[in-house]
A protein has these predicted regions:
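N-terminal Rossmann-like NAD(P) cofactor-binding subdomain of oxidoreductases
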Residues: 1-200, 204-211, 337-338, 345
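Acidic, glycine-rich segments within the central catalytic cores of soluble metabolic enzymes
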Residues: 179, 183-250
Length: 346
């Protein structure tokens, strides 16, 4: 399996960093090329020094760049191991050398090529498959949530969406509840750290709320996770709604859902089912926390979600459930899980 990253922003860099940490020998990393419109010097600096996850040096690695006649290669070192990855600077995906590199999977992490037509440009350039690292703008061959419907993954699907970090957190929770109790209604509030789509100071934006200063406001806005959830659980159409509140932190989000069920459920029964799922069918996807933690405690957590036991509560027939997730590391791990599962498909 050979992988290319298109886009080396927050998600692209976290994907690389995560893959490096997974490997016993980083020289065997299957990521062979990274494309981004930023200059190599800037990309190198942002990889080496990360405000959220710390420097590469703190995890025993260092990075530099080789420039041979204008061909840039990112070198990452860990002890006596060296990973080498081509750095490209091509704004048009159709012109990327995916055929030359024999790329199997492009992880599309720019946030810009989220329509089928634009993602298809990678296929025209010679890649076998594309995983869009975001909720799609229109249709794709499959929207995949690990732990729920990843059984649909196949090398016959040209364009796949990894939906969003919030969808990867929300759907396993809803799937578990629906399977055991039957969901009657779901209202979700996504409390999300600031993203690159927001403004540092008040400035023009298509969303007038996101136009306001990110570090100075709690900003209500839409959440793509509702539409994406319906791609995986279409029978919830008309039963689910929700929105996002962006808050001035740099990482980790939580979902706060209020649900009603098709049958009578007790609080103890609900907690038991979620805890059991976290230890069995969703062991690497969902964790269950019983400690009094706050958002920064979940930085670096590899799960899609961590259910907070203390904030599962009941009022009448309605239940409230809160779950945390590292919106960068958790999501990066799911994208890599998709790549590995595709690699093992016949």
């Amino acid at each position: 399996m050979l992988i290319a990253l298109n886009g080396f922003g927050r998600i692209g860099r976290t994907v690389l960093r995560t893959y490096l940490q997974r490997l016993d020998d980083i020289s065997k990393i299957p990521i062979v090329a990274i494309n981004d419109v930023a200059d190599p010097k800037t990309l190198l600096h942002l990889l080496n020094f990360d405000s959220t996850h710390g420097s590469l040096a703190k995890i025993g690695m260092s990075a530099d760049i080789e420039n041979t006649d204008g061909v840039f290669v990112l070198r990452i070192c860990r002890k006596n191991q060296i990973a080498k990855i081509f750095l490209l600077n091509e704004p048009d995906p159709q012109k990327l050398p995916w055929k030359v590199f024999k790329i199997n999977i492009v992880l599309e992490c720019t946030g810009h090529f989220r329509s089928y037509k634009k993602a298809n440009l990678h296929l025209k350039a010679g890649a076998k498959q594309v995983i869009i690292g975001a909720a799609p703008f229109d249709y794709v061959d499959a929207c995949v949530v690990m732990g729920v419907n990843d059984n649909v993954l196949s090398k016959k699907l040209p364009i796949i969406s990894g939906v969003s970090c919030t969808t990867q957190a929300l759907v396993p929770l809803l799937f578990t509840l629906d399977h055991v109790f039957g969901l009657n209604s779901v209202l979700m509030t996504e409390i999300h750290a600031t993203t690159a789509d927001q403004m540092v100071l008040d400035q023009a934006h298509r969303d007038l709320r996101r136009a306001r200063a990110a570090g100075h406001n709690m900003i209500p806005t839409t959440s793509s996770s509702i539409k994406a959830t319906l791609q995986v659980m279409p029978h919830l159409d008309g039963k689910i709604n929700g929105y996002s509140i962006r808050v001035p932190t740099i990482n980790v989000a939580c979902i706060d859902i209020t649900v009603t069920f098709d049958r009578y459920v007790t609080l103890d029964e609900l907690k038991t089912q979620l805890k059991t799922a976290s230890q069995t069918s969703l062991k690497s996807i969902m964790a269950y926390n019983e400690l009094p933690l706050v958002s920064s405690d979940f930085i670096g957590d590899t799960h899609s979600l961590v259910v907070d036991d203390e904030y599962i509560m009941q009022a009448g027939t309605a239940f409230k459930i809160m779950a945390w997730y590292d919106n960068e590391v958790g999501y990066a791990n799911r994208l890599l899980d998709m790549c590995n599962k595709l690699n093992n498909c016949l």
